[in-house]
């Protein structure tokens, strides 16, 4: 696909998304969107390319899937981006249409402050870390998965989101599938 055609396709996709998602323009000037922080880089790139191609300004606020969904339901924005499917009856009730625009992945990130081999964690070990059952990098379960890797004698500091997030939903869904203890205690959360 050549660059000009690509720009037109991006513009058309954004325009259709805005028109189908909301029956009126919430933004006074240009197109406004809000939602998934994971998808923000894609929307920023599309907005820049669409503007270069002569389209309207597009502003995207990466407030998280939950807040984006709330804003589109309250007609505070032209489109909302979420990482989790919204039930059909909810879409119908609120006069919304949903279609996929991007795909993203979730990867735990660690900072051991030492170079070396990549760290390996199983789903069960990851769940136990987030449950607080494994609290140090030199825990036998982590050492067993990483033979020969020099692990620090330090506590694991877990950082996570607290808002309604599609990433939280998908991550907790995964942990629920690999850990009966996680499923029983928390289950799938976020959206």
Q: Model regions: which residues?
A:
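Flexible loop/hinge segments at secondary-structure junctions
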Residues: 26-191
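Bacterial N-terminal signal peptides
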Residues: 11-23
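N-terminal secretory signal peptides that target proteins for export/translocation
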Residues: 1-7
